[in-house]
């Protein structure tokens, strides 16, 4: 019985130690969520300004540009998956990977070949475990995204997009990431990045209003050449910031759940230890009483 008490005591100590770790990680994630939200808010004006500029050029010009023109036939499509570098974040990475699998299945049903670009070690590990290939990978920047990484991803995607599919290029590009809705809610989202789908269009003039006259210097094509890579980089960087905030929120939620479970384990093992101690004491009392009765009857 004493051995059983020691086992329960050891389990209680182990659960308490685990709770200290998960509680610390929960607090760290809570702090990082605030910083991630601040970075999202700080980048929003720039992203909106770039989007409005691209919207104006795309709306008020009739130029055919490779980044805004729908291809006659889509043969190859790229999927960029934004996962995490670390685990202990609940279903954060698994949800975005599941969403990407559903997207890939849809694209294949349309007769398109798939090329993968992976961001985050969890996505890389997922593909390696299944012995599946990817075009390029980026790791080490999911928790604190850097614009240089977004630019690297954007340059690689634009280069692949302007290359004909017959020469190894792609006809369209999709990104899959977790959008940060709130601390309690993060949703996997799919966005078609190229050909360009302007998210924030230019408002149409009211009845009787005169359409503004836009003059582009130099040519419209040159303006698009300069604006669209910047737009792609800003969209990718926004996806990285959204994903980072979602990762910290998911990790905070997972660590809080782990801390709560540790509390429940401590309560359960404490009750079991008390029951074992009570049983041991009762057994000892019974042995003492039985011994006393035996001595009394032997006289």
From Swiss-Prot:
GO terms for CC?
A: plasma membrane; proton-transporting ATP synthase complex
| Membrane topology qualifier | Peripheral membrane protein
Under CDD domains, the record lists: F1-ATPase_gamma
What keywords appear on the UniProt entry?
ATP synthesis, Cell membrane, CF(1), Hydrogen ion transport, Ion transport, Membrane, Transport
UniProt-annotated location(s)? Cell membrane
Q: Name one GO molecular function term.
A: ATP binding
- One Pfam family, short name: ATP-synt
- Which SUPFAM superfamilies is this protein grouped with? ATP synthase (F1-ATPase), gamma subunit
BP GO terms, sorted: proton motive force-driven plasma membrane ATP synthesis
Write out the transmembrane intervals: none
What is the purpose of this protein?
Produces ATP from ADP in the presence of a proton gradient across the membrane. The gamma chain is believed to be important in regulating ATPase activity and the flow of protons through the CF(0) complex.
* Family under the similarity heading: Belongs to the ATPase gamma chain family.
Quaternary assembly: F-type ATPases have 2 components, CF(1) - the catalytic core - and CF(0) - the membrane proton channel. CF(1) has five subunits: alpha(3), beta(3), gamma(1), delta(1), epsilon(1). CF(0) has three main subunits: a, b and c.
Query: What HAMAP family does the entry give?
Result: ATP_synth_gamma_bact
Q: What is this protein called?
A: ATP synthase gamma chain
Organism of provenance? Clavibacter michiganensis subsp. michiganensis (strain NCPPB 382)
* Lineage, top ranks: Bacteria, Bacillati, Actinomycetota, Actinomycetes, Micrococcales
